[in-house]
C-alpha cells in the first residue's frame, strides 16, 4: 500500500512522464490552494527543470524508487536559491545559499520539489494560525485548523497537492496535524535525521519528519532522508533500510502498552476509535498490556520551560544585521535590534522568547530551567523502563478532532493540544501517528511510541495494520491516485 510505488509504476511504464506528473500537481495547487493556503512559495520553474532531469534518468534506465516523485517541503528546510521564511516576517526575503541535508537527500534521489509549505512561525504553534502568511485551512473542513506547526505539510498532502511532504516535530508538530488531517506521519528517533539547514526552534527536541497517506510511504521517505551527516553532531548513522527492514513481517509477537487513564476522559467517539484499534491489533496477534505512563501534565510543563529557553537562545541571532528583516527607521544600534525584532517576530514567537529569557534568568534558573531538565531525565528513564515490558506504547495523537479556527487562541488551551505527543520529544523516542477513526465526521489519529532507534517496529506495526484494515476512508477524493 504505497502511493510512491503506484507513481513509480506509472513513470516506469511510460504511462506518464515526470514533467507531466509535475504539471498535474502544479495545476492542482494553483487551482485549489487559494482555499487552503498551504503553500508559501511555489517552485514551478525549478520543479519542471528537476522533472526534466528525472525523465532523462528514467529514459536511461538509471532511476531509483524516488526518481521523479513530487514532494513539498516545510518552509524551515533551507533550499538553495529558493527563499526559506519559517513563515516569519523576519525571514520573508531570506534565500538560503545552501540546501539542508533533508532537502539535499531528496534532490540526490531525483525527487521533484514543488514548493515550500506554510507553518506556524518558527514552528511555534499547534494550529497553523501563527503564520505571517495567514492561517492554513483543513481540507476536511475549511473552517477548521489543520494542526501545527506543520499544518501546511498535512493540509497539502490531504488535499492531494503532493503524495508526500516533509515536516518537523518539536512537540508533536507532525503527529497532531496528521491526526487532524487523516494522514500517517512519523517523528523518528532523535538523531536519526539531520537538523543541518533546518531553522532551529528547540535544538534538543527538533527532528525532521514525514507525512503521507500510507505508513509504507512514510518509511520509504524516512530511509531516504535519514543517515549520518557531518554537519550535525547529534546525527547518528542508521542503516540504509532502517525504517523499511521489517515491513513484511507480521506483528504476532509484539506487545503494546496502554495506559487506560489516558483514554477514559476522551470524547466518546475517540474512545470508541481507540478501543476498535486495540481490538484490531489483537486480531493481528499483538498482546495488549496495561502500563503506567508518566504524568502528561508534568511533561507539558517541562516542555514549555525547556523549549522556550532553547528558542530564546536560537532566535537571538535574528537582529537585523547580517540577514532577516531590518527596521528602516532605527536611529542607533540598540534601536535597530529592538525595532527589528519587535516588528519581525509574531506574537507567539515573542511570547516564547520572553518565557525563555525569564526561565534562564539567574534568579529563576534553578527554580525553573534546572528543575525541568532534572524532570526530563526522570521521565525519560520512566518511559524507557516501560519498554522493558512492551515493544510499543499506544496513545491518542490528540485529545480531540480538528477544532475551529479561533477556538484556541488562548495560549494555554492551545498548548494542551500537544499533551499526548510531547513525551516522545522529551525522551527523544520515535513515534508514529496514523488514522484510526472519526469524531463528528472528522478524522482522529492514534499514536505508537517505541524505544529509541526501534523506529522499524513502529513502521512495521502500522504497515501491517493498514494492510489488513485499510485507510481508504481517510483519503479525500481529490488526493486519490
From Swiss-Prot:
One example of a Gene Ontology biological process annotation: translation
The keyword Nucleotide-binding is annotated on this UniProt entry: yes
Location of the active site: 74 (charge relay system), 149 (charge relay system), 173 (acyl-ester intermediate)
Entry keyword annotation includes Nucleotide-binding: yes
Catalytic activity, reaction form: L-glutamyl-tRNA(Gln) + L-glutamine + ATP + H2O = L-glutaminyl-tRNA(Gln) + L-glutamate + ADP + phosphate + H(+)
Keyword line: ATP-binding, Ligase, Nucleotide-binding, Protein biosynthesis
Any one Gene Ontology molecular-function term assigned to this protein's record: ATP binding
EC number(s) given by UniProt: 6.3.5.7
GO cellular component terms given for this protein: glutamyl-tRNA(Gln) amidotransferase complex
Domain of life: Bacteria
A Pfam family recorded for this sequence: Amidase
Subunit structure: Heterotrimer of A, B and C subunits.
Family statement drawn from the similarity comment of this UniProt entry: Belongs to the amidase family. GatA subfamily.
HAMAP family attached to this UniProt entry: GatA (MF_00120)
Function description: Allows the formation of correctly charged Gln-tRNA(Gln) through the transamidation of misacylated Glu-tRNA(Gln) in organisms which lack glutaminyl-tRNA synthetase. The reaction takes place in the presence of glutamine and ATP through an activated gamma-phospho-Glu-tRNA(Gln).
Protein name from the UniProt record: Glutamyl-tRNA(Gln) amidotransferase subunit A
Amino acid at each position: 500500500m504505497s502511493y510512491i510505488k503506484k507513481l513509480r509504476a506509472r513513470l516506469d511504464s511510460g504511462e506518464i512522464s515526470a514533467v507531466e506528473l509535475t504539471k498535474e500537481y502544479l495545476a492542482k495547487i494553483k487551482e485549489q490552494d487559494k482555499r487552503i493556503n498551504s503553500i508559501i512559495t511555489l517552485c514551478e520553474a525549478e520543479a519542471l527543470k528537476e522533472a526534466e532531469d528525472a525523465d532523462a534518468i528514467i529514459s536511461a534506465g538509471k532511476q531509483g524508487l524516488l526518481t521523479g516523485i513530487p514532494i513539498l517541503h516545510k518552509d524551515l528546510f533551507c533550499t538553495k536559491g529558493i527563499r526559506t521564511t519559517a513563515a516569519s516576517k523576519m525571514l520573508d526575503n531570506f534565500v538560503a545559499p545552501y540546501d539542508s541535508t533533508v532537502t539535499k537527500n531528496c534532490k540526490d534521489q531525483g525527487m521533484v520539489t514543488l514548493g515550500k509549505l506554510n507553518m506556524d512561525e518558527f514552528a511555534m504553534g499547534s494550529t497553523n494560525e501563527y503564520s505571517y502568511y495567514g492561517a492554513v485551512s483543513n481540507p476536511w473542513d475549511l473552517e477548521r485548523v489543520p494542526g501545527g506547526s506543520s499544518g501546511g505539510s498535512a493540509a497539502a498532502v490531504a488535499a492531494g497537492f503532493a503524495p508526500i511532504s516533509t515536516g518537523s516535530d518539536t512537540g508533536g508538530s507532525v503527529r497532531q496535524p496528521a491526526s487532524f488531517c487523516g494522514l500517517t506521519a512519523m517523528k523518528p528517533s532523535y538523531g536519526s535525521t539531520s537538523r543541518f539547514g533546518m531553522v532551529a526552534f528547540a535544538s534538543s527536541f527538533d527532528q525532521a519528519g514525514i507525512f503521507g497517506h500510507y505508513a509504507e510511504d512514510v518509511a520509504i521517505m524516512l530511509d531516504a532522508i535519514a543517515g549520518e551527516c557531518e554537519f550535525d553532531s547529534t546525527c547518528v548513522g542508521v542503516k540504509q533500510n532502517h525504517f523499511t527492514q521489517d515491513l513484511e513481517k507480521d506483528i504476532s509477537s509484539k506487545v503494546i502498552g496502554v495506559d487506560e487513564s489516558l483514554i477514559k476522559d476522551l470524547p466518546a467517539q475517540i474512545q470508541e476509535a481507540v478501543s476498535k484499534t486495540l481490538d484490531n491489533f489483537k486480531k493481528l496477534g499483538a498482546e495488549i498490556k496495561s502500563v503506567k505512563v508518566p504524568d502528561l501534565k508534568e511533561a507539558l510543563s517541562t516542555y514549555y520551560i525547556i523549549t522556550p529557553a532553547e528558542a530564546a537562545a536560537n532566535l537571538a541571532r535574528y537582529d537585523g544585521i547580517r540577514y532577516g528583516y531590518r527596521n528602516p527607521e532605527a536611529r542607533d544600534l540598540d534601536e535597530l535590534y529592538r525595532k527589528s525584532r519587535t516588528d519581525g517576530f509574531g506574537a507567539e514567537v515573542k511570547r516564547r522568547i520572553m518565557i525563555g529569557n525569564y526561565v534562564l534568568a539567574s534568579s529563576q534558573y534553578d527554580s525553573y530551567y534546572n528543575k525541568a531538565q532534572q524532570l526530563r531525565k526522570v521521565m525519560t528513564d520512566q518511559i524507557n523502563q516501560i519498554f522493558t515490558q512492551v515493544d510499543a506504547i499506544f496513545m491518542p495523537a490528540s485529545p480531540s478532532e480538528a477544532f475551529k479556527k479561533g477556538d484556541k487562541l488562548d495560549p494555554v488551551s492551545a498548548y494542551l493540544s500537544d499533551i499526548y505527543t510531547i513525551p516522545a520529544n522529551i525522551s527523544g523516542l520515535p513515534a508514529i501517528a496514523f488514522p484510526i477513526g472519526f469524531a463528528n465526521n472528522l478524522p482522529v489519529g492514534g499514536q505508537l511510541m517505541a524505544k529509541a532507534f526501534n523506529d522499524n517496529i513502529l513502521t512495521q506495526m502500522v504497515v501491517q495494520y493498514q494492510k489488513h484494515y485499510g485507510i481508504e476512508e481517510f483519503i479525500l477524493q481529490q488526493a486519490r491516485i
